Amino acid sequence: MPNFNRHQIRQAAFQVLFTLNANQSLELEDAYQAVLTMDQFDAEEVTPVEVPAYLAFLVSGVTENQAALDAALTPYLKKGWQLSRLAKPDLIILRLGLFEMQNSTEAPAKVALNEALELAKQFTDDQAKGFINGVLSKFVEA
């Protein structure tokens, strides 16, 4: 999959961030290659894939700004809830969506929100999708 569209890049960003969250000793480049070369799973020799610039922007942005993203998201949780109580896929999608909404010059906030909901549809359940929509839509309105 050498040419990635934006939706595929966002899917890959989610997968890389999820992989890094699950295995914190994994090197970033190894996480990128694990995700980007999945279609070569049966190949005898895996050919490394160049990391798309927008993928690197999203992943590095979320990892480097995680504390600020978490601080921005926390006020929108139900009373008594903490980010640590959220399912990891939900939290990763919230961080990724919020980072893109706040920092991408290429995707308007509404597009970033819609893409976050597409990730939620693929990687979480309907209840989580509704929660993610409720939280991130606050940032579109702001």
UniProtKB/Swiss-Prot annotation:
- GO CC term, one of those recorded: cytosol
Could you tell me the keywords of this UniProt record? Answer: RNA-binding, Transcription, Transcription antitermination, Transcription regulation
- SUPFAM superfamilies, sorted: NusB-like
The family database entries (InterPro entries) matched by this protein are listed as: NusB-like_sf, NusB_fam, NusB_RsmB_TIM44
GO biological process terms held by the UniProt record: DNA-templated transcription termination; transcription antitermination
Q: Domain of life here?
A: Bacteria
- GO MF annotations for this entry? RNA binding
Q: Which family does it belong to?
A: Belongs to the NusB family.
Q: Which NCBIfam families match?
A: nusB, PRK00202.1-1
Instruction: Sum up the protein's function in the record's words.
Output: Involved in transcription antitermination. Required for transcription of ribosomal RNA (rRNA) genes. Binds specifically to the boxA antiterminator sequence of the ribosomal RNA (rrn) operons.
Name the record gives this protein: Transcription antitermination protein NusB
Organism in which the protein naturally occurs = Latilactobacillus sakei subsp. sakei (strain 23K)
Gene name of the record = nusB
